[in-house]
Amino acid sequence: MGHINRLKEQCDRKILILDGAMGTEIQKYNLTEEDFRGERFADVPGQMKGNNDVLNLTRPDVISDIYRRYLEAGADIISANTFSSQRISQADYHLEDYAREMAYQGARLARIQADQFSTPDKPRFVAGDVGPTNKTCSMSPDVSNPAARDITYDELFDDCCEQIDGLIEGGVDVILIETVFDTLNCKAMIDAAFTMMKKRGVELPVMVSLTVSDLAGRTLSGQTIEAFLASLSPYPIFSVGMNCAFGAPQMKPFIERMGKIAPYYISAHPNAGLPNEMGAYDETPESMAPQIAEFIDEGLVNIIGGCCGTTPDFIARYAQMAEGKKPHVVTQRPQYMWLSGLDLLQVDDHVHAPIDSSRFVNVGERCNVAGSRKFLRLINEKSYEEALGIARKQVADGAAVVDVNMDDGLLDAKAEMVNFLNMIAAEPEIAKVPIMIDSSKWNVITAGLKCCQGKCIVNSISLKEGEEVFVAHAKDVLRYGAACVVMCFDEVGQATTFERRIEIAERAYHILVDQVGMNPLDIIFDPNVLAIATGMEEHDNYAVDFIRATEWITTHLPGAHVSGGVSNLSFSFRGNTYIREAIHSVFLHYAQQKGMDFGIVNAKARMDYHKIPKEQLDIIEDVVLNRRKGAYEDLIELAAEIKEKADAAKAAKAGGATAPKPAAPEWRKDSVENRLKYALRKGISDFLQVDIDEALGKYPHAVNVIEGPLMDGMNEVGELFGEGKMFLPQVVKTARTMKAAVSILQPHIEAEKEGGSSKAGKVVLATVKGDVHDIGKNIVAVVMSCNNYDVVDLGVMVPAEQIVRKAVEEKADAVGLSGLITPSLEEMVHVAQQMQNAGLRLPIMVGGATTSEMHVALKIAPVYDGPVVWVKDASLNAGICARLFGKDGAAYEAELKRRYEQLRQKYHEQQARLGSLQEARENKLNLF
């Protein structure tokens, strides 16, 4: 029996137990720097402590002991200690060349222990743990360049191939891709997993575990859970689930949502609650038991385990509770198409519905250099912001998908596609919808697919170059997790008749479904929309044949969809917009009734079929439906008549008549302060110049505009982000809008300062020694840079001495310390002590998942005379600095000191009221 079937058999009959935290257990051994280094890495520069994966090589006894204790506790699946065993993560420790060996050794040690505990009744499985790395493929690290990337899909894919190859050789039964915060990272890892399995001739189940960044349920890169599942839907993964970020109560609603729609086994391994003020986890196996019982008793999961703060004692308790309980019943695969950007687009199965039905998907056509002269000009001029405005307007006008095409002889289509798609990823109003990647060059399509975390549509593949190329392209579509448009072309040429259209569609369908293994729901046929009313009789039936072919495809090829480039139909009437849109409206009215559910159209220009005058409608229908010979001549006369009226109206306008101006958006009628705040919240920069000019006439100094309405807007954004009402890509876009506003104000500030520096201040940022997590710090850097602060980013694992030295050298105004793991809290105290010893009294801002205001009050503030501020989330740093550096800075410092004194007093009072565990047991209520 293969690995997949073995695990499937177990999941079908019982709830499997996954192990708990590795880092929590390693800390119990009180290992030294020398333990982590061993003799082998004694001379490697930098700190090694905290690199848990290197212990596979230097202290295999410790790692084996932890595996053993989880197996003794009853774990069915143990995770290899390989979370960071890839070059990207190990580069922080100068050990990238040892990453594969760490993966292999971590898996081998787990395999040895699992085999010792396995029995026929209770087989034990080893999961090769693949962590998310501290880099993201979907977001830019550069404030001024939203298209920039710290890492590419290909780089991540290559590193994960090496890691997974080591895991497979080490003997894992499962690949576990966990703590996923960026779906594009996850897709590269899934790609690597299946690539290496194929290379080694094995089939292993792939588990995927998501982490969300807020209670709204979005990933750090902005996707909803539903959009994430759509992105994964083309892959044959074994299970999906969630880990980290939350305790069980916070995670449960998301697991319920996932279980209702995900056609996979469901896993959950929550933290031992949420970190307390000191960064520790207060939950015990006993206190977690009723929380986990809800997952088990309600049939929400197939696999349950623990993440941060959990231990073998937790796992033993979960194993007892799960004994004999029924697992989650896997949901049926959806019978409708899933596409996604940041949000889910669900395309219902074919229903013969009217043209205005939501089942029809408008594909925006204007981001196509071949079809829009304006878009081509903007791309040629590198006017990307204006080009993005075209995409944004299409979505606002009703496009549910945006088509992007960069095929022009004078463009580097691949580079422009990558650049534009990366820029779209930074625009939530556009990125929320799926992208249709449109090119005649296959390398352009694959490059585009590697930029999108959502489930895209490839436009297109065909049998034009033969079956071998068709199959290869289709396999790439599957590999990168997309749907595809299939053109009705084959080796003979383009299908122009009904018979040829259905012949090619049927052949392509069976190759894709039966040979390639593509989900029929992910196939969109384009039976070729061709120009009618050309004066050539053989063209007269093109629209009718398309509509007939649409009905045949949706009837005989189950699940398949139909699309078309609608504007091709009216090509004979280019220059007469009214006639063209009327033809499109009539065509879509009939084609959709027969099952056409996608159309590449100008969504804004869609004409209402029912509002076309009867005498015009009769003529147009005669042409579209080929109801009588010579009808196109009547249409030509109608077109000429309409053009004549349009020309007359144009001439009248030129003679003095003016068209009414479009009504201003409602928010533009508000006060200048509210307009600026709204612009920041929404990331709208179009009106900044006019609004700032007005504000400069109202406020005495340019800096007052920043300190007033602009900072008020940023504070609102921070609050919305903290409440889960905004997500990270929106916050980053807001920060860029703030930067644009500051750049407008900058010359005024410089003039007022008579040439002095116009920067708001200089801030040194660092992830502290022993911690390699830098995504939060990078977000802080982006937001602060956009708020006109000079940011000096020292990177990760920065020793206290270096932070102090740089703060002095750079003449910094503040220091920002970041850390994700519990040991970082102690290191932050050490940094504050070193700054105190150096005579510095600069403000210190601390942030990260384990930090808290209470920890600052109890541990950091008492050892440092300067102000120390706990920053709840990345969007708030700029506002805090503005307060610290402003005229009321001294009052703010005094307020902080009073607040910390109150917190310390409250904490000590609570501790005085708490008895020991033994005292509590002795004083328990005895009811019997």
Locations of regions flagged by a protein language model:
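Domain-level signal for soluble alpha/beta catalytic cores
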Residues: M1-F928
